[in-house]
Design a protein with these regions (language model features):
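Conserved beta-strand hairpin/beta-sheet module of binuclear metal-dependent hydrolase folds
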Residues: 1-47, 151-170, 186
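Structured loop/turn residues at beta-strand edges in well-structured enzyme cores
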Residues: 49-52, 88, 120, 182, ...
Length: 249
């Protein structure tokens, strides 16, 4: 399994792309969130990922920096069906609010022949806590993260019989979400900022976004082996990795 970060920033970053990534195996890809616009196409190109090789997309919630890029993915993949006689169905997963928003946006901004692909070639799958599916030959179980601002969904991907990758969206981990995080080999978590800046700004209280210190302590508490922190500020990208690493220890 390979993880490719396509973007690491929060909603209004200008020096990097919004947080989204692919999970890949055998040159097939699972796209998790899509960022806020057609910048997703450049990020995929720069990462040598062909849209035609994306087998499924998951949108965690309806905020612009996660869902707007989905329209561009649908536009590009839809063309594969319309022009190139592409055969493989494309599955999109999300909670009821996310799937409804995707459908409404596509109806508003894409030609009808793209919208005609829904339910036949492009499959919209509504998921909630306990729903399971198989992507890249791996079992995935979805769960509601009990977000404060808007309905948001996370998932566990089982890497083998005993190891899992857990994605918990872009809000602070709730008490009810901890059971999904516990004993993860990999955790993907929101970490808005680090160090003194985080202490002074207090993103947990203001925006329900985590800090590096909060996530590091969470990992220690729940026996998480590895963590990917994203959805961050872009004010000091050159030193961000160093600052975050130091604050996590």
């Amino acid at each position: 399994m390979k993880i490719t970060m396509l973007g690491t920033g929060h909603a209004t970053v200008t020096n990097c792309y919004n947080t989204c990534f692919t999970i890949s195996e055998n040159n097939k890809h699972f796209l998790v969130d899509a960022g806020g616009g057609n910048g997703i196409l450049k990020q995929l190109k720069d990462s040598n990922i062909k849209p035609a090789d994306i087998v499924a997309m998951f949108i965690s919630h309806t905020h612009t920096d996660h869902i707007m890029g989905a329209v561009w993915i649908i536009r590009v993949i839809g063309r594969k069906y319309l022009v190139e006689d592409y055969k493989t169905p494309f599955n999109i997963y999300g909670n009821n609010e996310a799937i409804s928003a995707i459908r409404k946006m596509c109806e508003a901004v894409l030609p009808q022949k793209w919208n005609d692909l829904f339910e036949d070639k492009i499959i919209l799958n509504v998921v909630d806590t306990g729903v399971e599916t198989n992507i890249l030959n791996k079992k995935i179980e979805f769960f509601d993260i009990n977000a404060k601002k808007v309905k948001q969904t996370g998932f566990m991907m089982w890497l083998n019989e005993s190891e899992k990758f857990t994605f918990i969206g872009d809000e602070t981990c709730s008490e009810t979400t901890k059971k999904y995080v516990e004993n993860s080999k990999w955790l993907f978590a929101d970490a808005y900022m680090a160090g003194k800046e985080a202490e002074e700004y207090n993103p947990i209280q203001k925006h329900h976004h985590s800090t590096v210190k909060f996530v590091a302590e969470l990992c220690k508490e729940l026996n998480v082996k590895n963590v990917i922190m994203s959805h961050t500020v872009d004010t000091d990208l050159e030193n961000r990795k160093k600052l975050f690493t130091e604050d996590a220890h």
